[in-house]
């Protein structure tokens, strides 16, 4: 890291006081301390009071961001027959059947942001776990990416639908837009995600569920949010 960047990082961090912020204050502050020359992604990180080693405490879900992510996702669909035409008409960039499964398997090819499959193709798609799993691309009925209604699934993803899940350390990382977005849109997207995660609380989770929330950008500092954000989400 160059001295100039180091100075910028230090200056940005110094602008964040050692206290929790409201979401309404955190977003403008993150935009104010921007120094990168590219349009950074804004990320939300939530620390949850769950033990992800237990399947009944795994938090996983999907949410459609009201203002999208500022980029169009490339969608692939594995299906057959007329549903291939439906997927293409809905805007899927990559559509195929067994030949697409074979390409992904042989070449470890994942030049797409989301993958949808129809139930009849899951026996074949199941062979792709080693390629798709580590990249978070494996279709799953719980996230709506295993479905016969491929057109609706493609449109949802194009509209800003994203998937989230806890990692091994009980953190959920979710992008909520670009730093160039108006503050109101970033706030709306962030609240939509927080509300979804709050509602996804497993019944097996005991004690405090939302242990901490941090807002950050690609190059910017992490800004801790206060408990009122989660409280508001719980009432939404």
From Swiss-Prot:
Gene3D superfamilies: 3.30.190.20, 3.40.50.790. GO terms for cellular component: large ribosomal subunit. Pfam families: Ribosomal_L1. It comes from the Bacteria. Belongs to the universal ribosomal protein uL1 family. Part of the 50S ribosomal subunit. This is Large ribosomal subunit protein uL1. The lineage of its organism: Bacteria, Pseudomonadati, Acidobacteriota, Terriglobia, Terriglobales.
């Amino acid at each position: 890291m160059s001295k100039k960047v180091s100075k910028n990082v230090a200056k940005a961090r110094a602008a964040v006081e050692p206290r929790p912020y409201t979401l309404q204050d955190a977003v403008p502050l993150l935009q104010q301390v921007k120094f990168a020359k590219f349009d950074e992604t804004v990320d939300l990180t939530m620390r949850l009071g769950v033990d992800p080693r237990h399947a009944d405490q795994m938090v996983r879900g999907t949410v459609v961001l009201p203002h999208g992510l500022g980029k169009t996702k490339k969608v692939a669909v594995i299906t057959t027959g007329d549903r291939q035409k439906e997927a293409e008409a809905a805007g899927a960039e990559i559509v195929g059947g067994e030949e697409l499964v074979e390409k992904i398997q042989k070449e470890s090819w994942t030049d797409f942001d989301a993958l949808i499959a129809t139930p009849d193709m899951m026996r074949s798609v199941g062979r792709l776990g080693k390629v798709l799993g580590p990249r978070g691309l494996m279709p799953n009925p719980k996230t709506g990416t295993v479905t016969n209604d491929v057109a609706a699934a493609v449109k949802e993803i194009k509209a800003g639908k994203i998937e989230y899940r806890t990692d091994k350390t009980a953190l959920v990382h979710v992008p909520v837009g670009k730093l160039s977005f108006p503050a109101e849109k970033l706030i709306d997207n962030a609240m939509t995600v927080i509300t979804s995660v709050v509602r996804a609380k497993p019944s097996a989770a005991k004690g405090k569920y939302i242990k901490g929330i941090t807002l950050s950008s690609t190059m910017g500092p992490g800004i801790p949010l206060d408990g009122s954000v989660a409280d508001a989400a719980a009432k939404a």
